[in-house]
C-alpha cells in the first residue's frame, strides 16, 4: 500500500480548505481552525483516514476488483486519466452522464456503438462513405470517446469509486450509493461527507494535492496487483530456481 506522510501532504497543500463562509458544518470534526478566513484541515485526522482508504482500495485490487476514478473538473481531469491508465483501471474525467452506473444497460449500448465506430474508422468503412457522413461518424465517435472512453473496457459495474471532489461529483456518489458500490472520496471543507464510505478530508482544488492522492491510489492498485501475482504463483507451485 502506498504511504503518504504528513510532510507530503503539507508540501502539496492538502491542509488548505475553502473560505470559512463556504464551509459545510458536517466537516467540523475534520477542521483544525482557520487562517486568513480559510479553514485549515486537521492532517492528524487526514493521514490515518487516507491510510484506511488506501487499505480498502488495496483489498479490492488484490481481488482483481475494478476501480473507477472520477474527477470531471479541470483541476483533476488530466491527472485522473493518467492515474487510471497507469494502473490499468477506469475513469470518468469529463462529464458524468446521469445514469452512468444506475442505467448501465443503456450505457453499455453506447459503448458498443463507440467500439463499432472505432472498428469502422480502422477497417476502411469510413473511406467508403461520403465526406459528410464520414465527418458525422467521426464527430459521434469523438463525442462518445470523450464521455465513455475511460470506461469502454470496464465490462460491468465497478467495485469501488475513487472520487476527487465529493461536492462536484455528488451525482456519481448518489448512483454508487443506490447500487451499494463503496465510495472513497476527497472531501473538502465545503463538501458533504454523507454517502462517502471512506472520507479523506483534504484540499480538492490544488493540482499538487490532487496528483498526490491519485498517484498514491494508482501505486496502491499496482502494488496490490503485483502482490496478487506473487501469491498466485506460489499457490500454483512456481518457485524461482536458485
Swiss-Prot record:
Give coiled-coil spans as residue ranges. none
State the source organism's domain of life.
Answer: Bacteria
GO terms (molecular function) for this protein are:
structural constituent of ribosome
Keywords in alphabetical order: Ribonucleoprotein, Ribosomal protein
Gene3D superfamilies tied to this protein: Glucose-6-phosphate isomerase like protein, domain 1, Helix hairpin bin
Q: Which GO terms describe its cellular component?
A: cytosolic small ribosomal subunit
A Pfam family this chain is assigned to: Ribosomal_S2
- Report any one BP term from Gene Ontology: translation
Any signal peptide, and if so, which residues? none
HAMAP family from the UniProt entry: Ribosomal_uS2_B
Q: Family membership, please give it.
A: Belongs to the universal ribosomal protein uS2 family.
For this entry, the protein name equals Small ribosomal subunit protein uS2
